Structures are given as C-alpha cells and as structure tokens.
Amino acid sequence: MRDFKTYLSVAPVLSTLSLGFLTGFLIEMNRFFPDALTFPFFSF
C-alpha cells in the first residue's frame, strides 16, 4: 500500500513537469516560427 501511495504522489509531479516542458516547447516554437503550419526542419 505504501508503494501505491508513493506512485500516486509521483505521477502528478511527473505529468506536471512533462506538460510544462511541452507547453514551453510549443510557446518557443511559436515565438521563432509564428503561424507556421509546417516547420522547416520537419519537411521532407
């Protein structure tokens, strides 16, 4: 039961950090390439 409580306390922290990183990445990409439907380095 203690391990389950540890899991419940770690999962929100990891999800918050990963979502914070993702939002920061998207904000910076929109700052450097505003209104881009496709990014230049993703084109093949």
From Swiss-Prot:
It is a single-pass membrane protein. It is found in: Plastid membrane. The keyword Mitochondrion does not apply. Pfam families: PSI_PsaJ. The keyword ATP-binding does not apply. Coiled coil: none annotated. This is Photosystem I reaction center subunit IX. It comes from Cuscuta gronovii.
